[in-house]
């Protein structure tokens, strides 16, 4: 399976659909799934503008149509009746195949999501052409209940889309990155799943997003990783990478 990590710097506006289409059109022939970050259609600090900038599913039909040629995971502020959710979509075959509404909305320090979004209350597995999968959004995976849910379901692929700001620098590196890697690797090991993590880059109102998108094998090996702090689009053939990883384990184990 060929997964493309679309580590982008979205604008803080509704002017991001064309960016998605450009990447989709460029990489669709070499990809099975293209994965964008959390709120990739908007940027992160929408705050009061979330009400005017949120999309209905009809508003993004052009992206849904694009999934006739390649599966797509993306993030948006999703308007449903009178509620707005921080949502992750899995698009496939010209349809909205799955919607995950972020369960855990951070509301501490620099984060105020609970002020602007409704929370989701389910985290479900769904079938795709490439195996059973799940989607979670950023803070979701920092909760033991979600990790337990993933571990119980044991999907073949877990897509984790994020808007993680850089913080806690030290001589050893970026603390938030090492914390994320610990969570992602633990989830991969406990659930026996390939974990696909896509974080954004760029700056918004003093927040710098560190990127570092990656794919982790069920044995916790990092199969491929994007650069820090700059946009990058990277495609990985997970079948080959997993084969090589398992061969190295057998050789040295």
Where are these regions (language model features)?
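Cys-nucleophile CN-hydrolase/nitrilase-fold catalytic domain and related Cys-dependent amidase chemistry
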Residues: 11-13, 21-93, 97-99, 164-193
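Active-site catalytic loop in hydrolytic enzyme cores
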Residues: 57, 80-157, 161, 167-168, ...
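CN hydrolase (nitrilase-like) catalytic-core segments centered on the catalytic cysteine
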Residues: 57-73, 142-228
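Short, acidic/polar
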Residues: 16-26, 143-149
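Extreme N-terminal starter segment of soluble prokaryotic enzymes
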Residues: 1-5
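Hydrophobic residues at beta-strand termini and immediately following loops
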Residues: 6, 100, 126, 198, ...
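Binuclear metal-dependent phosphoesterase catalytic core
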Residues: 217, 221-247
